[in-house]
Amino acid sequence: LSLQSQHFAAEMGISPMTEGQKQSPWWTPERHLDRKPFLQARSAISRALRDWFEDEGFAEVETGILQKSPGNETHLHAPSADLTSASGDKLKYFLRTSPEFACKKLLAAGETKIVEFARVFRDRERGPLHLPEFTMLEWYRANESYEAVMADSVVVIAQAAQTTGIGTFAFRGKVADPFAEPDLLTVADAFTRFAAIDLLATIPHGQADREALAAAATDRVRITDDDTWSDIFSKVLVEHVEPHLGQGRLTILYEYPAPESALARAKPSDPRVAERFEVYACGVELANGFGELIDAGEQRSRFIAAMDEKERRYGERYPLDEDFLAAMTQMPEACGVALGFDRLVMLASGATRIDQVVWTPPPEDGP
């Protein structure tokens, strides 16, 4: 256990987990007792954050888990569910990878400040920071700039730390003060500082120049002939940039390059970058936020391009949510952010793996 975990456990009169207990199922009394302080921290943080969002005037919503389209990002994989209609027709649905589409439909319907503690699902993901089923804390503000949800994210993270009484987040030898003023860093500046790459030179007019980035990164990461601009970008980000983020204090990494804009809108004054940010603590990504794109035609083009690449890579593509694209035409200007609730609880409680902070974690060999 980490020092924070040991301290938390000691306060509860709980002995550290033995190696034998680690291998036992989560439902054994001994292992549950070892995890209980983390689970109590989870409940306390959930209550505190719900109170904060209510005080801020947010409506807590509950959106559906079954979706006709689970999202249209190249490397996200969704579990599927085969249903049968009352008339016997076979229906294909997916478990959502995010509540984003549904929440934005609510913005189109007239909601202005909404939040959801959403159960979401990702196939092909498992590890100290990943589970196939986890909780996404997602919230949206209509008619506000994305700096508003940036500020929210910092407050939410500090609220979690204040709730458990932890003074410093720690993970894999890195520490961060959740109460300190965050470090604001553009993606372009981060690539210059940590990888000596002029990232903006590889996206003239917002268009990805694969060969330019490959040439700039050839001595930094292993590049294959099949790698796209986005693949190379991700390799540099993961290997050379992310390890430096959120050390000592939170880092807000913002102004993502246009090819990585996803559902974010372009920065009005510079089309090479998007109104997208991520928040890091101890090298761990906690939150991902957007100034929301509301151009349905542009979003359709992005989705189709992402699904073309998904089909090339993985031999499958997900359908577009035409209902969502129609709702986009009614959406107000908005901003939103998705925060990994389990990861936040992990850092705020001193746990070392997110399955320690989940009440019923899936077994390593599947549910």
Stretches found by the model and what they are:
Residues H75, D89, E111, H130-M136, ...:
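A generic structural signal for well-ordered coil/turn residues at beta-strand boundaries
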Residues A296-P367:
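Active-site pocket scaffolds in enzymes
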Residues L39-S43, R47, D55, E60, ...:
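Conserved structured core elements
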Residues S2, F8, I14-A148, V156-A158, ...:
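Class II aminoacyl-tRNA synthetase-like tRNA-binding/catalytic domains
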